């Protein structure tokens, strides 16, 4: 009988621990990324202040502290990231290195601390925040 109680307690503990939270589906991409530099295809460079991409599950949030916050859908396939911002205006996306409400980025570099995205419009360099 004592063994049965221990078995039930062990099963309950395993269920409780495994039920906590959602696991990241995007690997190192999940989290908040601060934009360190934007290099436009025209050759111009920009260093935005307090601008971030936040990625979780299939959602992307673009935020510039005290200025704007834009939310959309994203799909990550390992070597590319496709962002769709259906309710955003293009002028609200420009400070984030996007020139349209649908943007495909090539993932040129991704570690747990650094991210480099490349589109036909701009190259973005991030650090994990």
What residue spans do the PLM features occupy?
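Short, exposed beta-strand-loop hairpins at the edges of beta-sheets
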Residues: 106-125
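Sec-dependent signal peptide recognition
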Residues: 5-11
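Generic short beta-strand segments
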Residues: 34-39, 57, 84-90, 120
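C-terminal motif of bacterial Sec signal peptides marking the signal peptidase cleavage site
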Residues: 16-19
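N-terminal glycine/threonine-rich, aromatic-flanked beta-hairpin/loop signature
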Residues: 45-88
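An anionic, turn-rich surface loop/hairpin at beta-sheet edges
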Residues: 83-108
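Tryptophan-anchored aromatic micro-motifs
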Residues: 28-44
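Bacterial signal peptide processing site
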Residues: 21-23
């Amino acid at each position: 009988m004592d063994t049965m109680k221990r078995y039930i307690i062990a099963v309950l503990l395993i269920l409780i621990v495994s039920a906590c939270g959602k696991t990241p589906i995007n690997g190192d991409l999940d989290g908040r990324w601060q934009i360190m530099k934007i290099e436009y295809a025209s050759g111009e460079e920009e260093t935005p202040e307090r601008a971030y991409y936040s990625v979780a599950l299939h959602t992307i949030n673009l935020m510039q502290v005290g200025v704007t916050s834009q939310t959309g859908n994203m799909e990550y396939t390992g070597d590319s990231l496709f962002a769709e911002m259906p309710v955003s205006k293009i002028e609200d996306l420009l400070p984030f290195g996007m020139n349209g409400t649908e943007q495909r980025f090539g993932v040129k570099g991704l570690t747990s601390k650094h991210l480099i995205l490349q589109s036909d419009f701009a190259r973005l360099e991030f650090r994990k925040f």
